[in-house]
């Protein structure tokens, strides 16, 4: 990043943040190929890894440098005058390099906007669990929530036009259009599915950048409203940069609706409005009434359709009351429930019992999705009965036990924020018995014999760090489940959710 910053600071008045020349630098492709920059992408192209070399990079740069213009033929996808015979390999390398280059202006502006602020120093904000303490603190005071499926069916050409207001380099935008029109097998619209995106595996970084940019644009109305309201102040809003074009659209949007709905513009200054985005969904929670939430729903649908040309069906935004609705949120079922309590009040010789209900944010671990994940990974059948893992039978006994134990510790680590650990005990039972069945299958023995042989050794592998400390300290007095079933812990080192289906 220092090299990028040094380049962009060279004669900035003439460069105007031009990033296109960086495509002719070898280190860009090395960085793009570095797995350290692609840690979040689970699916990688092994065939591309085998073909990558600096010699091919130099050959590609030489070939690009000799071309005066880009020419593409939609009728002949195998050979392109610009890319040559190695269309697939070269195009993939250019596209991955382009994905790195186009992120540079955003990264530099983000760093400059956060200079001197505490937000940039707090790496713990990256943790998925960091959102749950916020929900615990805020949601217990709120009444309604908008459960929003972020509109995603947007034409890629609209993304290119929107990107113009961030990237001033016309050459880079022309190259982006070139790629989008070159490959007819790419979808012309970004269409994320329920839990994953239908992006090409070899070009995930590029399309993830486009999708994240699209989401940032579609939700930037909330940043504008928070900045315009004197009641709402947010440190995180400093990470979004002012854009004259966008704010011009917002001002026009407000003027249009002011003419007809002056009496309800106060909803923009709701001091109890909170917004959270996760994966392809978002949550907008408020202390207001259902009428207020219906107005928000109406404004969001019209804003996305009129100013981002995205068709958003009203059914994609659900209005729910927090007191009787559970949110399926990042592997937890989160809800706000009433916790009744009785208070005795005594005046002289008379005493009274006063009932008091306190709202409390509650999180539980849904057992059915977890069993479904274990079933996909072939640790159990569809009913949750443990089965052996034949593909691991060739490993050593210690490796088999370590793999099963590590999976449970990861699951327990992630779901440590639940007060009720019953679901985790069920998962531990499935994984322990699946481990025993795998070992018995390997040695052609019975499960009973292996459980009798391993005993405490197998048990210790399925202890988390907290359980190990508790077990060693209070081994003779209390059971582990009694001491740990009442605690809630949020870890600030979790940056991703492990998918058991991909754990082979």
From Swiss-Prot:
The keyword tRNA processing applies. GO terms for biological process: mRNA processing; RNA splicing; tRNA processing. The keyword Plastid applies. It is found in: Plastid, Chloroplast. InterPro entries: Domain_X, Maturase_MatK, Maturase_MatK_N. Keywords: Chloroplast, mRNA processing, Plastid, RNA-binding, tRNA processing. GO terms for cellular component: chloroplast. One of its GO terms (molecular function) is RNA binding. Usually encoded in the trnK tRNA gene intron. Probably assists in splicing its own and other chloroplast group II introns. HAMAP family: MatK. Belongs to the intron maturase 2 family. MatK subfamily. This is Maturase K. It comes from Actinidia chinensis (Kiwi). The gene is matK.
